[in-house]
């Protein structure tokens, strides 16, 4: 992300927000159907879906594509814009600050900036993912004779009415843990893989200054794998906290009590599968826009 870091403070921040928003929206459209399946696997009350394929098949046969796989996309689409804008602007601004005012090593700058970016993003993400998770499992809950909202605004209104404005941040602790550690893994993997690929192929072309398209795509896909693999148990806990209105400790106890250790990894396969194209697109689009 050298192009973004070279610009002035205000100009760079504005461009990071714009470019991050566009990249985030594109990535969300790619990953959302897979995310719906993941959330349903994570939050099922019993072993309704023994496999990922059984969940996909059930969702398609009973709800179709739009209502089944894209239920509740409006909220996370806006959230993806806010999340990625926050991630990239926080990361690049923190990197600039550390580079200018400290003697922290380049790797240290990446790790610290990634953690700061993830922490900031968690504040934006919690309300968005709360609404998203509720909508993604709403059709299942309606089928089980529970009255649930299946639209964004009524869902938000119901949360505020029942729990107040602070209720929108149900699951903040789980999201903070996931995003702070995940931010480190996400940015560090991207920067390290990109630099490694660039350095290796610079031997053939010493004058080449920019990364090739395939290098950006591989780096972004690798970052997505690292992020999701490293924080998946925290993501499972967060999903249960938000769909069942329980604390972090109770969510951990409930998951482990019902499914054991493997319960924290339900839906991991499809999550890693979706992580590659979605994150490859996010980083490629962001880097391309930043270079304009």
Curated annotation (Swiss-Prot):
Q: Where would you find the membrane-spanning parts of this chain?
A: 14-34, 69-89, 104-124, 171-187, 213-233, 267-287
InterPro entries, alphabetized: Mitochondrial_Carrier, Mitochondrial_sb/sol_carrier, Mt_carrier_dom_sf
Descriptive protein name: Mitochondrial ornithine transporter 1
Cellular localisation: Mitochondrion inner membrane
Q: Name one GO cellular component term.
A: mitochondrial envelope
Q: Provide the alphabetized UniProt keywords.
A: Amino-acid biosynthesis, Arginine biosynthesis, Membrane, Mitochondrion, Mitochondrion inner membrane, Repeat, Transmembrane, Transmembrane helix, Transport
What organism is the protein native to?
A: Saccharomyces cerevisiae (strain ATCC 204508 / S288c) (Baker's yeast)
Please share what else the UniProt entry notes about this protein. Answer: Present with 432 molecules/cell in log phase SD medium.
**How does the UniProt record describe the way this protein sits in the membrane?**
Multi-pass membrane protein
Quote the PROSITE patterns the UniProt record gives.
SOLCAR
């Amino acid at each position: 992300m050298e192009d973004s870091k070279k610009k002035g403070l205000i100009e760079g921040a504005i461009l990071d927000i714009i470019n991050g928003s566009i990249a985030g929206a594109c990535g969300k459209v790619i990953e959302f159907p897979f995310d719906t399946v993941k959330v349903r696997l994570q939050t099922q009350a019993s072993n309704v879906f023994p496999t990922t394929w059984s969940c996909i098949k059930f969702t398609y046969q009973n709800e179709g594509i739009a209502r089944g796989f894209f239920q509740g996309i409006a909220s996370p689409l806006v959230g993806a814009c806010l999340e990625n804008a926050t991630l990239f602007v926080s990361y690049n601004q923190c990197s600039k600050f550390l580079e200018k005012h400290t003697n922290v090593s380049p790797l240290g700058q990446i790790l610290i900036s990634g953690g700061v970016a993830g922490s900031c993003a968690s504040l934006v993400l919690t309300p968005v993912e709360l609404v998203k998770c509720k909508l993604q499992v709403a059709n299942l809950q309606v089928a089980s004779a529970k009255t649930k909202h299946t639209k964004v605004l009524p869902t938000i209104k119901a949360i505020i009415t029942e729990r107040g404005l602070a209720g929108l941040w149900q699951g903040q602790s789980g999201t903070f843990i996931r995003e702070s550690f995940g931010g480190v893994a996400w940015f560090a993997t991207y920067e390290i893989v990109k630099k490694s690929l660039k350095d290796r192929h610079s031997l053939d072309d010493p004058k080449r200054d920019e990364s090739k398209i395939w290098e950006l795509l591989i780096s972004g896909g690798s970052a997505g794998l690292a992020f999701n693999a490293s924080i998946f148990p925290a993501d499972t806990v967060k999903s249960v906290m938000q769909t069942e209105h329980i604390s972090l400790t109770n969510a951990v106890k409930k998951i482990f009590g019902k499914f054991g250790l493997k319960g924290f990894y339900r839906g991991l396969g499809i999550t890693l599968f979706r992580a590659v194209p979605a994150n490859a697109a996010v980083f490629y689009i962001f880097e391309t826009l930043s270079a304009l």
